[in-house]
């Protein structure tokens, strides 16, 4: 039985039974897909926001993990439609495999609990992981769907300027037939996708105020970590998590942090200092990529030194050193298939990594993102933040705190 017999193919073409999601996509819902979408496991994702704390800075960014999952599933159907005519793919993938792939695309986030990405970045053994089976098999096609939707809801244009249709049309199998790749015709579209991710990280996902909120959430959870119940977290949605953290933080130094994020009044900490790898290599190298336990200890020592230097006392619980995750976020592992020269009789396709044939990707993912966007930042309550920002010799004080 060929892939063309999949009911989702016909549903995609007919638009007869589906649901609409932004920007302007019709998601095909066959009876078997609808049964999954209507299950309690998937419906919980309607109560988990896709961008979490980003909505504190971009108020429109309140779309859900359910909307995102529907978009990834639709993209997976489009992948299969494109690859149906690939002889190698048709040999390797039958209808059962394809059906499992579609189910995995729809269900890839069912393990997502509220605010799990910033909390998983802490690397705490108390916190569960939400990883899902087929995430790596989607060619970062998930990213293609994410960017346009996140950009639309955030009210910014940055994630919508790449040619998704061209990227889909260039899909093929990689050299070993084990993963998705693109033909050389899709290289520019892939470069634009990487650029869109770069700008979205720079201006939205890692906006300095979003990082402030993230640092506040991480410190609050760090303070109350003895009370963490992994099973409860795995079932949480945004509202239940906020309620749990607010109640658990009551009477602890985490209380003002939780209140600033989830209370009736929004109160985000202010940026006291920022250090990128290009202009402040020593401080950046000393802190970036450290464990959360290390940055918490550095924060405490730094607060002690700053309190001795400044007229304003600095609370060690509310001085936050934000070290971005070590993993690179904007490039993706992808092979590009280059066709042989027309005069080369008997020659086969040549294969290259995208970053090896694209100076754009190399520059964005390495020089630009690692050196300029992945900044180490110091956040604090507004009053001490202003004093810290004007503190003379701050870099030396920070390096002393790092050294212990």
Residue spans of the language-model regions?
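Short alpha-helix carrying the canonical HExxH Zn2+-binding catalytic motif
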Residues: 99-107
């Amino acid at each position: 039985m060929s892939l063309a017999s999949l009911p989702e193919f016909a549903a995609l073409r007919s638009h007869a039974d589906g649901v609409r999601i932004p920007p302007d996509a019709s998601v095909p819902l066959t009876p078997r897909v609808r049964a999954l979408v209507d299950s309690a496991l998937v419906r919980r994702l309607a109560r988990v926001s896709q961008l979490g704390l980003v909505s504190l800075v971009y108020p429109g960014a309140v779309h859900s993990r359910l909307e995102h999952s529907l978009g990834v599933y639709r993209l997976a159907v489009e992948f299969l439609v494109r690859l149906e005519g690939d002889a190698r793919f048709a040999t390797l993938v039958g209808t059962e495999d394809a059906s499992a792939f579609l189910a995995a695309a729809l269900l890839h986030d069912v393990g997502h609990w509220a605010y799990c990405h910033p909390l998983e970045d802490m690397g705490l053994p108390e916190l569960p992981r939400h990883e899902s089976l087929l995430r790596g098999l989607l060619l970062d096609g998930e990213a293609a769907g994410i960017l346009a939707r996140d950009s639309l809801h955030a009210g910014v244009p940055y994630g919508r300027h790449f040619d998704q249709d061209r990227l889909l049309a260039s899909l093929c199998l990689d050299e070993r037939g084990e993963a998705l790749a693109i033909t050389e015709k899709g290289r520019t579209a892939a470069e634009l996708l990487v650029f869109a991710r770069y700008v979205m990280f720079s201006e939205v996902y890692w906006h300095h105020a979003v990082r402030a909120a993230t640092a506040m959430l991480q410190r609050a959870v760090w303070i109350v970590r003895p009370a963490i119940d992994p099973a409860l977290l795995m079932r949480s949605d945004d509202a239940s998590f906020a309620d749990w953290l607010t109640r658990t933080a009551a009477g602890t130094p985490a209380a003002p942090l939780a209140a600033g994020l989830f209370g009736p009044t929004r109160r985000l900490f202010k940026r006291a200092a920022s250090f990128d790898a290009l202009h402040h290599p020593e401080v950046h190298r000393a802190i970036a990529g450290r464990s959360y336990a290390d940055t918490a200890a550095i924060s405490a020592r730094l607060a002690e030194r700053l309190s001795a230097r400044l007229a304003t006392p600095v609370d060690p619980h509310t001085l936050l050193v934000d070290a971005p995750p070590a993993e690179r976020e904007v490039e993706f592992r992808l092979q590009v298939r280059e066709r042989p020269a027309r005069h080369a009789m008997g020659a086969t396709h040549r294969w290259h990594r995208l970053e090896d044939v694209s100076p754009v990707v190399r520059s964005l993912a390495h020089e630009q993102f690692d050196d300029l966007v992945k900044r180490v930042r110091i956040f604090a309550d507004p009053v001490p933040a202003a004093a810290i920002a004007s503190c003379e010799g701050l870099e030396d004080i920070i390096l002393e705190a790092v050294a212990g």
